[in-house]
């Protein structure tokens, strides 16, 4: 049975909004990651990160940053860094993906890695192998012509 999370505090809840990534923060909390606005790189867009406490079932906004990206397609948290997968261009133009790096302690956007290809990002996760953090991101074609999993070594260990 699925458990419904009350997301009524989100801007545009129930409409087309950019709140589309959930990842584990710690044993008690999940992070909900998304953007305000249309998801098409407007100057007023913001990245918002919310914490969802699994015990109290309470969703609270943690922080907000200026944002110059488009649709969020996935997120993962490891070693104090929040990695966010996005498309790199607006709707119906699929020419690649980005992985953004956010230092959550300092609430600061650190970096963006751009991957150019005829497709878009589809999810994001990590794995620690031999003490190194690797990011795994789905790379998919909107036309259904291909689907790959990309493996990227994190520069932020």
Predicted regions and their residues:
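Short loop/turn segments immediately following the C-termini of beta-strands
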Residues: 34-38, 42, 87-90, 129, ...
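Short loop/turn segments that connect beta-strands within beta-propeller blades
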Residues: 53-57, 103-107
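Repeated scaffold domains used in trafficking and secretory/extracellular systems
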Residues: 12-24, 68-76, 118-128
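Structural motif
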Residues: 39-51, 91-101, 143-157
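Short coil/turn segments that connect the beta-strands within blades of beta-propeller domains
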Residues: 27-29, 79-81, 131-133
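Blade-level signature of beta-propeller repeat domains, shared across WD40, Kelch, NHL, RCC1
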Residues: 123-157
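A short beta-strand motif characteristic of beta-propeller blades
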Residues: 2-13, 58-65, 108-114
């Amino acid at each position: 049975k699925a458990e419904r999370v009350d997301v009524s505090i989100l801007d545009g809840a129930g409409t087309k909004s950019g709140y589309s990534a959930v990842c584990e923060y710690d044993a008690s909390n999940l992070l909900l990651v998304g953007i305000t606005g249309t998801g098409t790189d407007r100057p007023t867009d913001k990245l918002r990160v919310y914490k969802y406490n699994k015990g109290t079932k309470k969703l609270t906004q943690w922080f907000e940053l200026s944002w110059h990206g488009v649709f969020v397609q996935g997120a993962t948290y490891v070693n104090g860094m929040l990695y966010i997968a996005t498309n790199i261009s607006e709707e119906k133009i699929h020419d690649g993906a980005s992985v953004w790096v956010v230092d959550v302690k300092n609430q600061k956007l650190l970096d963006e890695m751009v991957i150019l290809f005829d497709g878009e990002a589809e999810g994001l996760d990590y794995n620690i192998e031999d003490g190194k953090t690797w990011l795994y991101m789905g790379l998919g074609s909107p036309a259904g012509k291909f689907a790959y999993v990309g493996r990227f070594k994190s520069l932020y260990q």
